[in-house]
Each structure stands twice: as structure tokens, then as C-alpha cells.
From Swiss-Prot:
Transport found in the keyword field: no
Its job: Binds to 23S rRNA.
Name under which the protein is recorded: Large ribosomal subunit protein uL14c
Source organism phylogeny: Eukaryota, Viridiplantae, Streptophyta, Charophyceae, Charales
One Gene Ontology cellular component: cytosolic large ribosomal subunit
Gene Ontology terms, MF aspect: large ribosomal subunit rRNA binding; structural constituent of ribosome
PANTHER family from the UniProt entry: 50S/60S RIBOSOMAL PROTEIN L14/L23 (PTHR11761), LARGE RIBOSOMAL SUBUNIT PROTEIN UL14M (PTHR11761:SF3)
One GO term of the biological process aspect: translation
A Pfam family matched in the record: Ribosomal_L14
Transmembrane segments: none
Source organism superkingdom: Eukaryota
CDD domains: Ribosomal_uL14
InterPro entries to which the protein is assigned, alphabetical: Ribosomal_uL14, Ribosomal_uL14_bac-type, Ribosomal_uL14_CS, Ribosomal_uL14_sf
Length: 122
């Protein structure tokens, strides 16, 4: 569960390292974002000489959360960190690589490009 003011790691090579969530999209009164939800975030930490700079406002998709998500089969999937992938206006990732595992629920949310770039899909 990601809420406003939550910090997330960046799971791609776009140049940002840490994000802070400032708004959850796709709902007017939603307080928490889960895996597959789109958020608006501000870059708190970035690598120098990259395309994304510190204090830039970006859109991102949550790909991992420490709070477990329950599947239809009864299995609960839980990750070690909160992580997101930065996307552009079309919904495609701005980076060319995705680091770490991602959940299968991203495919249902039509983020197939992120799923195809990920090394492991759980």
C-alpha cells in the first residue's frame, strides 16, 4: 500500500533512484496504491548527467510493494521493497531495462512492455 508521502525505489535505468508519491491516479478518493496503479511522484534522488533530474515530477507504475497482495488461488505475494517504474504519457517505460521481479498483475493492467522487460515475473 503506497500512500502520499511514501518513498519508493526506482526499478529501471531511467536515472532516478528514489521517488516520493504525491498523488494516486485513476481514482478521486483513493488513499492507497497497490501493484499496477499509476501514481504521480517527485524525484528525490537521481544519478547525475541523466535525462531525469532531481525535483522533476513524473508518472510511475507501482511494480512491487511490501504489503502483500492476495491472488484468487489464495497465495499472497510480498516483496522486500516498494518500487516503481517511470512511464511516459503513452504508458511506456522511460528506461530500457527493468531491475528485479515484478508481479503478474501488471499484465492484466496492460503494462505488457514492463512485464516483457522484467527479468522475472512472479
Amino acid at each position: 500500500m503506497i500512500q502520499t508521502q511514501s518513498f519508493l525505489n526506482v526499478a529501471d535505468n531511467s536515472g532516478a533512484r528514489k521517488l516520493m508519491c504525491i498523488r494516486i491516479l485513476n481514482s478521486s478518493n483513493c488513499k492507497y496504491a497497490n501493484i499496477g496503479d499509476t501514481i504521480i511522484a517527485v524525484v528525490k534522488e537521481a544519478i547525475p548527467n541523466m535525462s531525469i533530474k532531481k525535483s522533476e515530477i513524473v508518472k510511475a507504475v507501482v511494480v512491487r510493494t511490501r504489503k502483500g497482495i492476495k491472488r484468487q488461488s489464495g497465495i499472497t505475494i510480498r516483496f522486500d521493497d516498494n518500487a516503481a517504474v517511470i512511464i511516459n504519457q503513452d504508458g511506456n517505460p522511460r528506461g530500457t531495462r527493468v531491475f528485479g521481479p515484478v508481479a503478474r498483475e501488471l499484465r492484466e493492467e496492460n503494462f505488457t512492455k514492463i512485464v516483457s522487460l522484467a527479468p522475472e515475473v512472479l
